[in-house]
């Protein structure tokens, strides 16, 4: 179906094939042509039909190709989310077809730097036109209208843009420039977001480094909750932008000793610290004195709780930190409280006598310190604790007591048993961690189980890890249902 006689047989090279939804099923190509030709000559219309019906019925959507790109964009501006067709409840949806995404503007747009400020748009067009048809050329100018010495050039195809890069990048030094011309693909919105987050994180790192708190674990009592909360926020933002940025975080001073998984543990620690700081105080006060860590352990063990012994057992895991506390002069309860950003809340707070939520938050915070201490002071930390737990728990399917078994959805495809174990170890003693594998494909099914030796650790893990973002996925962490339930999970 060709357009009017004043058009060639084929549409322009930069024409866009558009997908159109929310079209009445009773409309045919003729009806649609009358609608679209208001904005320009139409080359082709293809109504999508259900071939399983006889005769085939419209699916309420179509593809339309105008002769010119301009006509397609004008139609989109006038119709998309603007016009409701007869008999429909929602406005027309009009956007470039999926096949057009392969030729998106951001894939064809070049940034040209180090150009002479005497050049205008026409000069740039002449310079780059040998490499293909130029769709747009724009020189960046300041408020005074003067050139900033850089420009954007958009070709009609990516291949043309790549040819221009190979031929022109650093090929000459223009008048008034100190270095050769720069020709590269322009930053996409995703690139800009990643750079912004990395820059923001770098600034905060420098502030923390200036405070000299990371070089000495005993000095971490100066690390306030605002810093831990900031790390949690930045880690989540970065994961949303690009999972690869976690590697960038781990390479930045002064966090160079932490890998991506340990950074995630630190983020979980921040959430735990924040939860503990906001918890109402109970009846058993916990003071930030200079007593050794063992005092905290014994105090927790004797604190009253309405939920029985199960709510205080997790505090026994703090004994693993006594070696670290003893080996580090000056590292006492006050220092550890500062590290966990609890120094404000613990001074007047205490272990809850009702819900045990403060106890849970403390369990999260101090077990999280084990992960940080292992990364920051490996020579002082007893690595055998983690090694023994890893060997015994990863890949096994042992179950803990009632209420201590978790079901984890939306795991990244590449996660294995060991990754799952490391992610949930900060919240207590893991007796098993298992990622389920499809036996036919040998690939992860993206869900798994984690079992603790007590319910409080499981609740702590749910509180911090449910909704935690890894890459483009958010974990769903919930208790595994009782065997007595009709549905196992």
Swiss-Prot record:
Keywords: Activator, Cytoplasm, mRNA processing, mRNA splicing, Nucleus, Repeat, RNA-binding. Residues 16-99, 108-188, 404-482 form the RRM domain. PROSITE patterns: RRM (PS50102). The keyword tRNA processing does not apply. Pfam families: RRM_1 (PF00076). This is CUGBP Elav-like family member 1. CDD domains: RRM1_CELF1_2_Bruno, RRM2_CELF1_2, RRM3_CELF1_2. One of its GO terms (cellular component) is ribonucleoprotein complex. PANTHER family: RNA BINDING PROTEIN. The lineage of its organism: Eukaryota, Metazoa, Chordata, Craniata, Vertebrata. RNA-binding protein that may be involved in pre-mRNA alternative splicing, mRNA translation activation and stability. GO terms for biological process: mRNA splice site recognition; regulation of alternative mRNA splicing, via spliceosome. It comes from Gallus gallus (Chicken).
């Amino acid at each position: 179906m060709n357009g009017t006689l004043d058009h060639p047989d084929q549409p322009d090279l930069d024409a866009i094939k558009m997908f159109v939804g929310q079209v009445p099923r009773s409309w045919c190509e003729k009806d649609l042509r009358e609608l679209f030709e208001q904005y320009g000559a139409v080359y082709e219309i293809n109504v999508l039909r259900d071939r399983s019906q006889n005769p085939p019925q419209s699916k309420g959507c179509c593809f339309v190709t105008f002769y010119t790109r301009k006509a397609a964009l004008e139609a989109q501006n006038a119709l998309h989310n603007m016009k409701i067709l007869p008999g429909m409840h929602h406005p027309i949806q009009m956007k470039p077809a999926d096949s057009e995404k392969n030729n998106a503007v951001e894939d064809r747009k070049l940034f040209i730097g180090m150009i002479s400020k005497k050049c205008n748009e026409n000069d740039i067009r002449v310079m780059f036109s040998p490499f293909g048809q130029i769709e747009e050329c724009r020189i960046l100018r300041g408020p005074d209208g003067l050139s900033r010495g850089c420009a954007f050039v958009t070709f009609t195809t990516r291949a043309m843009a790549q040819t221009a890069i190979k031929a022109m990048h650093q090929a000459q030094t223009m008048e008034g420039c100190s270095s050769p011309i720069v020709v590269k693909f322009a930053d996409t919105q995703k690139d800009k977001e990643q750079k912004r987050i990395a820059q923001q994180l770098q600034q905060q790192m420098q502030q923390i480094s200036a405070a000299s708190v990371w070089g000495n674990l005993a000095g971490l009592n100066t690390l306030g909750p605002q810093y831990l909360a900031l790390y949690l926020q930045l880690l989540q933002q970065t994961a949303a932008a690009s999972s690869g940025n976690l590697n960038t975080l781990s390479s930045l001073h002064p966090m160079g000793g932490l890998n991506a998984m340990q950074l995630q543990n630190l983020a979980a620690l921040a959430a735990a610290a924040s939860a503990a700081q906001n918890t109402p105080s109970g009846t058993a006060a916990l003071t930030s004195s200079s007593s050794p860590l063992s005092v905290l352990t014994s105090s927790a063990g004797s604190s009253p709780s309405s939920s029985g012994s199960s709510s205080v057992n997790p505090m026994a895991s703090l004994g693993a930190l006594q070696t670290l506390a003893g080996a580090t002069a000056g590292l006492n309860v006050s220092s550890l409280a500062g590290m966990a950003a609890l120094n404000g809340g613990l001074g007047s707070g205490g272990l809850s006598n009702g819900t045990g939520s403060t106890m849970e938050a403390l369990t999260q915070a101090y077990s999280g310190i084990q992960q940080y201490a292992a990364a920051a002071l490996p020579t002082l930390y007893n690595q055998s604790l983690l090694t023994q737990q890893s060997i015994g728990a990863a890949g096994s399917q042992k179950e803990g007591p009632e209420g201590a078994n978790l079901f984890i959805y939306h795991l990244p495809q590449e996660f294995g048993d060991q990754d799952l174990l490391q992610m949930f170890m900060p919240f207590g003693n893991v007796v098993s961690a298992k990622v389920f594998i499809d036996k036919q494909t040998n690939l992860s099914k993206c869900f798994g189980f984690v079992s603790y030796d007590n319910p409080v650790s499981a609740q702590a893990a749910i509180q911090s890890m449910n909704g935690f973002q890894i890459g483009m996925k958010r974990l769903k962490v919930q208790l595994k249902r009782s065997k007595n339930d009709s549905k196992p999970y």
